[in-house]
Amino acid sequence: MKRARVVTLNAALGPLDYRVPEGMHVEPGSIVVAPLGPRQLLGVAWESERLPTNEVPDSRLRPLAGLIDVPPIAAPLRRLCEWTADYYLAPLASVLRMVLPSSAALEGSRQLIEYRPTGSVPPRLTPQREKALAALEGRQGTIRELADHAGVSDAVLRGLVNAGALEAVAVDADRPLACPDPDFAPPELNEDQQEAAASLASAVGKGFDPVLLDGVTGSGKTEVYFEAIAECLRQGKQALVLLPEIALTEPFLKRFEARFGCQPVAWHSDLRSSQRRRAWRGIASGEAAVTVGARSALFLPYPNLGLIVIDEAHEPSFKQEDGVQYHARDTAVMRGKFEDIPVILSTATPPIESKQMVELGRYREVSLTERFAGASLPDIRAIDLTQDPPPRGRWLAPQLVTEIEANLDRGEQSLLFLNRRGFAPLTLCRHCGHRFQCPNCTAWMVEHRLMHRLACHHCGHVMPPPKACPECGEEDSLVACGPGVERIADEVAELFPDARTAIVTSDTIWSPLRAAEFVGAMEA
């Protein structure tokens, strides 16, 4: 009788032994359905010698209930899961949940109903129907896709279906993924960039090689590591690019498409369930050649991974703060070690840990010291607010206001940065001096005027702003102290009423779509 040791996705359980039914082929990494009492749980078969447990007699073992028809989790990824669980003190089951984040992805192929023109003309041909038929000649897609392409409503197309002008066609929902072309639009690199690109590309296919790509802002780091991705594609391997924020995904996808002719597979928390399913299956099958994503993309089951790139490797947002609390930058290096592939850490401000690794000889360093096309670094000036203070009740220095005004006169844009979300960092009572503190952690409550609430940026507690002071009961005595981005935006709107302004924080830009809309508005 054959036994299988299984790690279920229930963190409260340890490894469990099951009997493998006749005819079921289970190997380490196989994704199985394991019975537990009246329930059935997803689990992953594991090497028995790596996960010791109490031996159970063969006669007491329950048979596995099923085997999921997806590729097994490869040994390098299993070793990474073990390392992550051990290093970050997390249950192995919790780590495996990041490998198998979508139960829908484990289901079989689905069918999708699409529509295409039949060639017949409906008896009643309205201008909208005529417009749709002209635009859809030779095309096929869902009602939503065809309506968007033709510039008409869904109802117009459904009317054409009822009239026999469009026919339904059942197709596989898992459409083929586009394959990036490494030679689609090679960039013109300067001598330093060519040397750096050659160094990175030569590392692909030659084993574990962590590289710190250290380049000043605007030096072309992205174009350089794109050449390493191109070499990875030429060798028929998969590449992974990690970004610190999902808001950066859409702009990056456009740059990637301009270089390789199509967009890569995206992976982040804002994807719809159907998109996550398609992306996961494409990655697991090896069909997805390049994946761009946030932290969680690191644990996906790439069967033929050849390169990992961590863009903006200095960013603290690579640290996962809930669930399994891991650092994606360091964990990516470990995945590169287990996969025996190069890992590129791209940054303009290298973390101290990475520089130390270079000093110790554990990382290789590739430097880009000059900006692309001879561009100069910006002129930086510090304004002494004790010598040039803003007027009472204002926060922008007069010299800064003058420079913004000159920028507007030239038709140029201005970016103002302040590391404080909301309207004001502190709310207090003018009558008794009471300061609003979080009841959970005693941090100050930050006023968010756009969302009409007070919020704690430490623990997440929120409350509506009261009309009276809770300490002394005085009404209309509450005052906001200090500036947040919303307050600065109000001041800018007062000073420059004809200028178009936007607030960019995690409160207003919470998805790649919103980020893309903002970037589009800036570029318009």
Model regions: which residues?
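Accessory, non-ATPase domains that flank or precede helicase/AAA+ motor cores in DNA-metabolism machines
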Residues: 1-347, 354, 359-375, 409, ...
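Accessory helical-bundle/CTD segments and flexible terminal tails appended to RecA-like ATPase motors
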Residues: 97-124, 381, 386, 434-437, ...
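Inter-lobe coupling/hinge region of RecA-like P-loop helicase motors
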Residues: 181, 377-399, 504-506, 514
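Conserved interdomain hinge at the start of the Helicase C-terminal
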Residues: 229-230, 388-417
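Conserved RecA-like helicase motor-core motifs
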Residues: 240, 260-271, 439-440, 446-449, ...
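Conserved helicase ATPase core of P-loop NTP-dependent helicases/translocases
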Residues: 272-284, 500-505, 509-524
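SF2 helicase motor core recognition
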Residues: 293-305, 492, 512, 519-524
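Cys/His-rich short segments
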Residues: 400, 409-494
